């Protein structure tokens, strides 16, 4: 705030000082003298209202950038809608190309068993992608209930001024506290939290599988289409040169029809889009898989990293209190209780709820063993 006032009042103060230095203090008219007095009076009033000895440069910078923060928070909400529409349009375009361009080509070349395998796998993968994306968008991540005093809280949220349970963090875009918040995903236009974290990861995983499947399966078609496009460019160039050398203006008929041209371009588009998404989304999926194996979220990774360094400086070892072991972490995350659940809850669409309520967490075995040993002593 102090920097803003100096920026606005600096030119006016400089003009008044120049007038005083030029000798207008005694010879200035009453009107100018009154302006000088009002300026000084206004400056005193402004300082008496806004001056704060505890405010520094950080406070001034935060106040100056507050409109920018507000603009970003509100614009990102609309960007989320655009990103969701973009995901739907791009996914729909790949499905349309697969039915209109790829399917007629493979029907003439693939055997019946191979066609059956591709038919079942592709539709199974597509169903899982659509199901998990829809669930990730429409399922609330989970919010701590307000007005209850029986919740085990860790701290008080500085934004909401409400009790904040363990693993709960405030989302500045949603302007709410989220249970076991991982991050705010603009591609979902939703926060990723306790109740939709599984849907988010499953969508990333099956979308990566689908992109790898399309990219690998259409490799031969992509090479043929790319070679055909290069041939079309060369033929178009030769055709223009031939027309320019002729004395009569008669365009020769095209060698490739419009449908063939669009088919070749669509196959190239499919391969490049699926390959790029497979690389980018695959890296993100691997990263979240590592975090899930460690029993932490994206936010908790940064918090645990700082805590690990702090304890390491004191000669102590940090252990994540929510790490149940790699396999048990995946069971808790996926909601798997029996061996049959790997099929019915992971490989098939399932809307089962995750373990727990997102506000209280059972301690891992090593914490229970340590507490028992302390009680025994």
Curated annotation (Swiss-Prot):
It is a multi-pass membrane protein. It is found in: Endoplasmic reticulum membrane. Keywords: Acyltransferase, Apoptosis, DNA damage, Endoplasmic reticulum, Membrane, Transferase, Transmembrane, Transmembrane helix. Residues 155-205 form the DHHC domain. Interacts with ABL1. Interacts with COPS5/JAB1. It is an enzyme of class 2 (transferase). Residues 99-116, 220-266 are lumenal. Its EC number is 2.3.1.225. The active site is at residue 185. The chain crosses the membrane at residues 78-98, 117-137, 199-219, 267-287. The DHHC domain is required for palmitoyltransferase activity. Palmitoyl acyltransferase that mediates palmitoylation of proteins such as PLN and ZDHHC6. Required during embryonic heart development and cardiac function, possibly by mediating palmitoylation of PLN, thereby affecting PLN phosphorylation and homooligomerization. Also required for eye development. Palmitoylates ZDHHC6, affecting the quaternary assembly of ZDHHC6, its localization, stability and function. May play a role in DNA damage response. May be involved in apoptosis regulation. Involved in the proliferation of neural stem cells by regulating the FGF/ERK pathway. GO terms for biological process: apoptotic process; DNA damage response; eye development; heart development; protein palmitoylation; telencephalon development. It holds the Pfam family DHHC. Its main location: endoplasmic reticulum. This is Palmitoyltransferase ZDHHC16. Belongs to the DHHC palmitoyltransferase family. It comes from Macaca fascicularis (Crab-eating macaque). It catalyses: L-cysteinyl-[protein] + hexadecanoyl-CoA = S-hexadecanoyl-L-cysteinyl-[protein] + CoA. One of its GO terms (molecular function) is protein-cysteine S-palmitoyltransferase activity. One of its GO terms (cellular component) is endoplasmic reticulum membrane. Residues 1-77, 138-198, 288-377 are cytoplasmic. It comes from the Eukaryota.
